[in-house]
Amino acid sequence: MDYKTQFAESLSNIFTNELTQKQILDLIETPKQDEFGDAAFPCFSLAKQYKKSPAIIAKEVAEKLSDPFFTKVEAVGPYVNVFFNRDTVSDAVLKTILAEKEEYGQNHFGCEKTVVIDYSSPNIAKPFSMGHLRSTMIGNSLKHIAEKCGYEVVGINYIGDWGTQFGKLITAYKKWGNEAVVKEDPIRELFKLYVQFHEEIKDDEELEEEGRAWFKKLEEGDEEAVELWNWFRHESLKEFSRIYELLGVEFTNFQGEAFYNNLMEDFIGILEEHDLLEESEGALVVNLEEEGMPPCLIRKSDGATIYATRDLTAALYRQNTFGFDKALYVVGPEQSLHFNQFFTVLKKLGYTWVDGMEHVPFGFILKDGKKMSTRKGRVILLEEVLEEAIELAKQNIEEKNPNLKQKEEVAKQVGAGAVIFHDLKNERMHNIEFSLENMLKFEGETGPYVQYTHARACSILRKESVEFETCTFTLKDDYSWNIVKLLNKFPEVIEAACNKNEPSVISKYVLDVAQSFNKYYGNVRILDENAEKDSRLALVYAVTVVLKEGLRLLGVEAPEEM
């Protein structure tokens, strides 16, 4: 039951011609102070129609509004404020959560629709750095949120597995590589070779030509070049899979850039058919001057295609294969122009489905105010950060609860969860200041704080067993009421997170629920034997359901003991 909908329904019986129930619902606000009620309806938009001041309209509406659902209705200036019957609402909300369990919050507006989400997309033979964390975790969370809203979700890891860098890497491996050494630590060793190539090229310009020659061989299907490329790709994907497992991230497919090699000429043919290609200094481009953008480069003067061609080809392939209604590209803000050009070219081709495509950018991870990329002159590996976080979580557990069962498993859940939650707790366009020490604290706005609150609630339920099926729940105190109101908001929070492509909406929400529950825990004697005990335990159970599901939508696990 949504009490705002109930309020909107009651108001729509008064405003039969002036406003629809949906318009009323959109206008309803939640007062910042409890003394102004549980919901408020502003009357400003009706002043012109009624030819009366909003305050007079509010007074007249308050007099007409009667519903057993409300214990009090009052006009305060231009607002109609209502106080809900706490017994009725708490009983309805708790019964809904107890019945639906982890299904609670499910929306259906995405039913029979498909969304493709392109996220993570690391480059083969390069380390999985902290820079990849944001795209990976934002995309993973958006995938869970879209599924919760009824969408069929296709999660694509558009691996960077093609390009001239592979000619350079093959050259470096042929000159300085050792198969046994590479097999021991593939990504680190291949990256070392790639870096060595760029060091050596300063004194040996012929290396550039050798790199080009090997890439040409690769494009032409040379057996040795293809065999090495396949090996580099296979070893890299094995490494990436280990990190994805640690983060709990899954994809529908790993169709990378190379997958589209044989499809690009067909797409270039479509551009030619629509007379969109122009020659510019020997290259082929789509002119976007009318749209106020530089031309979109399709084929370089040496005949090579670039990533715009690949992305355009991939978009058409994905539409033909999955018939998507929405396509999200979770990629850094530096690619904004590329996506504007890419979407505009598709529009010029007359594809209406481009309206469902969206670039979902995000801020940077900073260390001491600077973009985080190197530590002692090298790339900061995400795996190292996760291992460090898990180790610190283990130390925290040893200090706080040395007898905890499954310490290793819980340390993984807390360590990885801390890194993920820290990434998702702020609006995605905000830059993030990285601090392992802060993100692992058990108090404040952290993942471990929410996880610990969930574990605390679970520990209360282990002490008592209640059959909730036959109960009627009555909760009147302010601490309980604040939680009930928050729990009731969960479905609309999920919908807002989905519509805004914004996981932080859920992060902030679970923090609010955790803080509200901890106030309740500190002020209410939950296990006291009296008439409200079953209702209080039902509330605790409902909190565990919503916290666990909220964390799951973020890609964070919720241990039952910590």
Swiss-Prot record:
InterPro entries: Arg-tRNA-ligase (IPR001278), Arg-tRNA-synth_N (IPR005148), Arg-tRNA-synth_N_sf (IPR036695), ArgRS_core (IPR035684), DALR_anticod-bd (IPR008909), Rossmann-like_a/b/a_fold (IPR014729), tRNAsynth_Ia_anticodon-bd (IPR009080). Its EC number is 6.1.1.19. Transmembrane segments: none annotated. A motif ('HIGH' region) lies at residues 122-132. GO terms for biological process: arginyl-tRNA aminoacylation. Keywords: Aminoacyl-tRNA synthetase, ATP-binding, Cytoplasm, Ligase, Nucleotide-binding, Protein biosynthesis. GO terms for molecular function: arginine-tRNA ligase activity; ATP binding. It catalyses: tRNA(Arg) + L-arginine + ATP = L-arginyl-tRNA(Arg) + AMP + diphosphate. One of its GO terms (cellular component) is cytoplasm. It is found in: Cytoplasm. Belongs to the class-I aminoacyl-tRNA synthetase family. Monomer. This is Arginine--tRNA ligase 1. It comes from Bacillus cereus (strain ZK / E33L). The lineage of its organism: Bacteria, Bacillati, Bacillota, Bacilli, Bacillales. The gene is argS1.
